[in-house]
Amino acid sequence: MPVKIIDHVYAQYLLTQLRNRNTKGIDFRKGLVRLGRIVGYELVRYFPTREVEVETPLGKAVGIEILGLDKVIIVQILRAAMPFVEGLLKAFPQARLGVIAARRKEEGGVVDVEVFYSKIPTVEREDIVIVADPMLATGITMTRAIEEVYRVGQPGRLIVVSVIATPVGIERVLSKYPETEIFVVAIDPTLNDKAFIVPGLGDAGDRAFST
């Protein structure tokens, strides 16, 4: 299961609101937070569980424990991922946080990415690293981010979460890091000449922060 589309009805509703060009500023940002929460809850479905017995005030009950919640590291790619990760943290409140700052470079019509800041917690073999970026467009930024994760350590699981991805971005990530699990809310068909996803939702960072 390298790629999973999150088809939860509320996630698809929120995506529609984010795509709408008339959704402005704070509403866009709040939408990313809400969507991050839903995506987080969907991710938890793919965590292992075990049966446990607990004492209630009136007796005993059998339930489940979710394994690995205390081993999650969320790495956010600034700045569009900030509200998205705020939502993810509702599902993973114990997560440790890492930050990567990157900028696009265009030279001679070629788009590249430069990572100019990276601060990631120590990664151990039992850890689950979630790399979050709302837009998985060319996949260049994401592969750079994964490189930074592996500089720190080798996780047990590597998960990429995005709102919208393209086949190009997915292929670039999986061709270099086939062990990656990718969760997205939608896959859009193409990129324009500026490497933005079409139809996409525009520049997520600019729209979230009204810049």
Swiss-Prot record:
GO terms for biological process: UMP salvage; uracil salvage. Its cofactor is Mg(2+). Keywords: Allosteric enzyme, Glycosyltransferase, GTP-binding, Magnesium, Nucleotide-binding, Transferase. Belongs to the UPRTase family. Uracil binds at I197, G202, D203, A204. Binds 1 Mg(2+) ion per subunit. The magnesium is bound as Mg-PRPP. SUPFAM superfamilies: PRTase-like (SSF53271). Its EC number is 2.4.2.9. GTP binds at K30, G31, L32, V33, R34. The keyword GTP-binding applies. Allosterically activated by GTP. The keyword Ligase does not apply. It catalyses: UMP + diphosphate = 5-phospho-alpha-D-ribose 1-diphosphate + uracil. This is Uracil phosphoribosyltransferase. The gene is upp. InterPro entries: PRibTrfase_dom, PRTase-like, Upp_A, Ura_phspho_trans. GO terms for molecular function: GTP binding; magnesium ion binding; uracil phosphoribosyltransferase activity. Pathway: Pyrimidine metabolism; UMP biosynthesis via salvage pathway; UMP from uracil: step 1/1. Catalyzes the conversion of uracil and 5-phospho-alpha-D-ribose 1-diphosphate (PRPP) to UMP and diphosphate. 5-phospho-alpha-D-ribose 1-diphosphate binds at R79, R104, D133, P134, M135, L136, A137, T138, G139, I140, T141, D203. It comes from Pyrobaculum islandicum (strain DSM 4184 / JCM 9189 / GEO3).
